[in-house]
């Protein structure tokens, strides 16, 4: 072996070379080596040919390059190595192997001192969990973290992710995804979109900037799927044991086939199937609108079982035949449902009622207006069939032209604000991640892989 003091205070050792030529290139002394194996400290590399620039700390290598260090193995087509900086400019078919991770790129600047790799032209990361690709990226080996920019895609057995840029710490499983993002979560049967996402190993996901969550739940009793759409400025999903929680903030809109709502804040518990709405909320179920400072929506097997609101709620039911608006208000209101239809409303204390009546021909025929400490209304298939009022003070209003416009104090009816079912399904914007590697694998990489398989 020949030691050559070509790198300042360090030495490059020529362990093997079929041919050694000393020459001058552009006035610089160069040693040209063919079928070379060189080492410097714990850095060892092989190539078809290598040029040692004897007057400066550089080695240029060409063809079938393999670099071995205690922490990584690298393959490339060409290499410029700056010894003092411990920096390599790797070009061509570049593969970096670190533990169970493989990184692929076409143009990579890798620093052996800091263990940081800059992937300038495409990056593909493969590990036991899945595959991640992007237009460019930076990989930090010591912290096992990475930044990816441009057309970022991640796919594993549980999810598919797209975005403009991504930061991920693989050790802590913390990630931040930015701009034009979509997450398809096959484990939880959910889809998320927005412009910023945080996620960690606890299952927490925080979504903001045009946040959207679509959740599909299958009814265990009927096997029918119910889809819930939630929009908001911010949405946070967390999990504790088998219970999932949803917290949404800022202009929160919900649509499902069972109910829809509008609020400043929403909280949901999957075990209790309870939605809690805060901040001047409104909730709709079929032809009923409920408004109040606080509303809870209790589901059972994904069907609305109960709506509760306090203090000072106001409920409106639109008659499906006449279009007239039945109204009820008070301090607390509870509405109960059976098989999706309203079956009973309790309102107490200080209840007030305006209910429009119909004749046998289903034509408008006056109205009942009353006040009572407590009112209970009973319905059959959505139609009022009986009313109970304690200490009732009321009157019957005969039919007249303006009766349809009569309103109780505090009247709220805003059907134009009711969220509607989204008409466009969010879809990935990028083609699927290819199962194939981005280039034909270098010969030394293939040979090494074949040996390990034997």
Predicted features along the sequence, with ranges:
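N-terminal amphipathic/hydrophobic interface segments
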Residues: 7-454
